Structure formats: C-alpha cells, structure tokens
Amino acid sequence: DTMKMLEIEVDGDTCISPSFRIDLERPADLAEEVARIYGYNNIPSTVIKGIANASLTPKQKFRRTLENATVAVGCYGILTYSFISPKYFDKIALPADSSLRKTVVISNPLGEDTSVMRTTTLPSMLETLSLNYKNRNAAVALYEIGKEYLPTAPDKLPEEPDRLTIGMYGDDADFFTLKGMVETILETAGLHDCTYKACGTDAPFDEICALHPGRSAVIYAGETPIGYLGEVHPTVQKNYDIGTRTYVAKLLIDEMQPLAQTEITYQ
C-alpha cells in the first residue's frame, strides 16, 4: 500500500520509481520514504550496540612477541621485496638440484632482478647487508619478518610460510653474539631448552651451503628443526662484496608457534 501511495511499481525484489521522483536512486531512499509514510514515531527506538574490541590472533601475538624480542636484542627492522633474481641462488652457492630453485615465476616482472618469488629470505638479507657495507656503515644488526613462496602444484597457490631472518656484521659481531641473541629471542617466545647441532651434509636446510661449515649450526626444538645460524661462507661473502665477517640466522615462525609455551604459570 505504501508503495502504491508513492506511485512506485513493485515487481518481486525490483522497485521502479516514477519519472518525477529523480531523488529515488538506491534502496536507502526507498527505506526513507517508507519510514516517512509509516511515521518515524512508530519505529521503536533501539540502543546502539558497542563494537567489540578487536584482538590479535594467536599467530599475530606470537609474531609480535618475536618482533619485540628481536628489537630488544638490538636489531633494526627492514622490509625487502618478495621477488628476486634467479641469479641470487648462485650468489649463495645453492646446489643446482635444490628444491629452492623451483620458483613461482612472475608473468610481468619489472626486470630480471625481480622475476621470481623468493623461496628463501637469505639472499634478501645479504643484499641489504651488502648495501649497508657499501654505504660505509661500520656495524649493523638487521632483521626481517617476511614470507617465502614455496610452489606446491602447477594449479595451486604456493605455500607462504613466515620467516624471521637476522643479519649482522661489525666489530662486536661474532658467532656467539648471534647465538646469544637467538637464544634470548627463543626464550622470550616460549621455546625453552633448544639445542644446536653443527651443520653437516645431513642438515635439513639447503641454504647451509652459504654458511661457514665450521661456524654454523641447526637449531632444534626437541626433534624439530626450527632454524639455523652461523657465519657466512667467505666465498658467499665475497659474492656480496662484504669485506668483513658476516653472520646470519633464520627462524621458521610457522614451525615454532605450535611448540612455544605461551601460557605463563606461577608457583
């Protein structure tokens, strides 16, 4: 009846306004007309409900804890491109048969240097350390929380695990300094009693080839490998034109979170 009074034709869910009502353009305009005819005083008043405060997901909380802990040990955050050059794999001496060389290729890249999605965050960190060294920064300690892109099948999207990568050089930088920083980060994140095993041919990370064989280690939480750390191999260091000993670490955030003890108990 209200629509007839307003000379609005109704056909199912479609309303056709008369030609002289150019002000009726969208559903809100029709609702306003119906409310006006029905009477605003006849519409019951309701109290506006408050919007619930948003909260972080467990993954976001864990990532924030890691980031805060990394900043607390003296690292500065960086943000690098997720796409790299295939030549970066040669610079870190990655084996020719490594699965990390199987990448997601970008169909319209900006250039050869950004033509594939990275399967490891290590080259991005080393490129940034190299840039800082060339700009004569005497000592740096950097970190990045970023994704790697690991292909699964031709018709499926790649996996996108989160990684925490740390890189440093300078007079105060050495293997044990980096190890102490990583231990502090892990303890703060709720991963206690982690163990370190010297890198060997059976190391579960292909990037180990970029590290000095006698000054590197794989990090374990129980039986699960959660990362690695060590001094960059002299050959790789030379590939990046870094003229001083350089140290890197990578932690697997997605693998770490289920193992972390995030609940605090008091005795």
Where are these regions (language model features)?
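Extended beta-strand-rich architecture
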Residues: 1-267
